[in-house]
Amino acid sequence: MISLKRIFCTCCLLLSVWAVFAQGPSKWKALEKPLNFYLANDLGRNGYYDQKPIAELMGQMAENVDIEAVVAAGDVHHFEGVRSVNDPLWMTNYELVYSHPELMIPWYPILGNHEYRGNTQAVLDYSQVSARWEMPARYYTKVLENDDITVRLVMIDTAPLLDKYRKDTEKYPDACKQDMDKQLAWLDSVLTSAKEDWVLVVGHHPIYADTDKNDSERLDMEKRVDSILRKHNNVNMYLCGHIHNFQHIRKAGSKIYGA
């Protein structure tokens, strides 16, 4: 079994990023492992609330550490999603913010609840506009490989799995249109066949969290997603966003780490 230390996941969250910043470029190189990627979520702030300086820091760090990709775990666009691939928010939330040359690498995004307040198909269609925005479907899987290490990313679409969003058709019109059972069957199938060194499932909503957000979200995630993850001994981590802070959780009786 490969040590967890051999995979380096940098979470783009305010406290953890500024902790890395305090170390300085002279120490960043020592953090490099055979396969490195950023996990970034809940980004879309039009450059405000420290989004722009953190984006610049991500670029500076990538000058010293070989970053393979950015895994974007939803809510790239606050607060009402986007209306089309030509929506100005693509510039102010994304292109003009993450403009450092070292961030011109593959981005693997999923939808968050805020994208579901807009045109979700436009988020997928942006893959035809931007060479780095690689989102082939609402849920999909991607394998990263380097130096004989393989990591399977299993990217899931969590808003349609939660009754809160499915029932609120006025605010989240696309959520109820998605086939929940089909996605869950797909997730089970992908995990059954996954043979990589590391299997990381990525969704926007947490399964377990210390938060004042609606308990029903996590109860639905526990019932529908965690029940599948626990069936498979090859799942190492569940990575998510939504709660706007950093938590590292392992539920009693589970071998899966959540962050």
Regions found by a protein language model. Give the residues of each.
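Residue-level marker for buried hydrophobic side chains located in beta-strands
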Residues: 37-39, 70-72, 109, 201, ...
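Bacterial Sec-dependent N-terminal signal peptides
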Residues: 1-23
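N-terminal active-site segment of His-dependent metallophosphoesterases
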Residues: 19-88, 181, 210
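Extended active-site neighborhood of metal-dependent phosphoesterases/phosphodiesterases
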Residues: 31, 78-199, 213-237, 243-259
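Active-site clefts of carbohydrate-active enzymes
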Residues: 205-213
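Active-site metal-binding loops of divalent metal-dependent hydrolases
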Residues: 40-45, 74-76, 113-114, 158-159, ...
